[in-house]
């Protein structure tokens, strides 16, 4: 799709699988709120566990914000096979006055590439020139939110899927998987229950945050796109990628929030995108902000095509 083959693609996202490809390829996407787009996999051998349902979302990818918005409207239609689908309007009330955007303050322990800092500043400037009010603000406990995501998803996979996955996959996959596991706590039943309870605490904190700042501007990845085999180098490298580079991606899944990714710039020939995160079922606010950035940054794939010509 980024190369011009097809106009709209369909993906899903439980830890970044819509937003990370969009970032790497210079296209637009939105991970909708959990329950916005119905999902049903008729070929699945068994139902997914509850938290996998609550952290996963189906969504569109396209070359422009307008195409993503149109695709989301089509994909959001009711399907009775998904008991988690929610009938909520795609457009909500506009916040009063200029919309306040929180430019997420990056944690002190994050290794952030200067090109990402520059892209975030450019996106913030684009929003301000479009009438938004942007302030750098610390978002609620991004480290704790990410750890809750990691603990829940890794432990669910270990219990229900790990043996089957390892039996049919390569040593490279085993390296990548063990790198992901390295950052997770091993949970017994009481630990898993505490982790799922913590999810509600985190969501409440973010919902209160959105009362003051309806949109959050955050990085997709804080480091340049890695090489094609970076996830096979070592389990330590994989663990670092998930914790450092992609922390702001996966944390949003456990919150169930809508998050759009829009490309901002090229750095050494590679696209850099940013996330626009909004409150539950406020995909419209995230996409409006993404459209404001796109209006000034342009449709990035056109620059990529010129570069490749």
Give each language-model segment a name.
Residues 205-208, 239-262:
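Small-aliphatic-rich amphipathic alpha-helix that forms the alpha element of a beta-alpha
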Residues 194, 225-246:
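Short, surface-exposed loop/helix-turn segments at secondary-structure junctions
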Residues 114-138, 161-170, 192-213, 291:
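Acyltransferase
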Residues 1-72, 253-266, 270-273:
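Short glycine/serine-rich loop segments
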Residues 1-15, 99, 121-125, 129-131, ...:
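Gly/Ser-rich catalytic/binding loops embedded in alpha/beta enzyme cores
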């Amino acid at each position: 799709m980024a190369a011009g083959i097809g106009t709209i693609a369909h993906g899903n996202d439980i830890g970044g699988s819509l937003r990370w490809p969009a970032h790497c390829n210079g296209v637009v996407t939105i991970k909708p709120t959990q329950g916005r787009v119905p999902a049903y996999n008729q070929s699945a051998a068994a139902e997914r566990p509850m938290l996998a349902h609550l952290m996963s979302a189906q969504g569109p990818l396209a070359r422009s914000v307008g195409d993503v918005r149109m695709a989301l409207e089509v994909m959001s239609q009711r399907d009775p096979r998904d008991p988690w689908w929610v009938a909520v309007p795609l457009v909500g009330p506009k916040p009063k006055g200029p919309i306040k955007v929180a430019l997420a303050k990056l944690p002190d322990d994050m290794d952030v590439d200067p090109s990402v800092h520059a892209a975030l500043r450019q996106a913030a400037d684009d929003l301000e020139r479009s009438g938004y009010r942007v302030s750098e603000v610390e978002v609620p406990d991004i480290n704790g939110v990410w750890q809750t995501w990691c603990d829940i998803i890794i432990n669910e996979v270990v219990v229900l899927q790990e043996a089957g996955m390892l039996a049919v996959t390569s040593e490279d996959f085993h390296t990548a998987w063990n790198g992901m596991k390295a950052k997770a706590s091993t949970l017994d039943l009481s630990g898993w229950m505490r982790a799922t309870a913590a999810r509600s605490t985190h969501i409440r904190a973010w919902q209160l945050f959105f009362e003051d700042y309806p949109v959050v501007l955050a990085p997709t990845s804080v480091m340049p796109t890695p090489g094609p085999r970076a996830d096979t180098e070592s389990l330590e490298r994989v663990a670092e990628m998930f914790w450092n580079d992609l922390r702001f991606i996966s944390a949003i899944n456990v919150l169930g929030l809508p998050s759009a990714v829009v490309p901002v710039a090229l750095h050494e020939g590679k696209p850099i995108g940013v996330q626009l995160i909004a409150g539950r079922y406020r995909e419209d606010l995230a996409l409006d902000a993404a459209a404001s950035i796109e209006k000034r940054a342009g449709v990035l794939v056109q620059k990529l095509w010129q570069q490749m010509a």
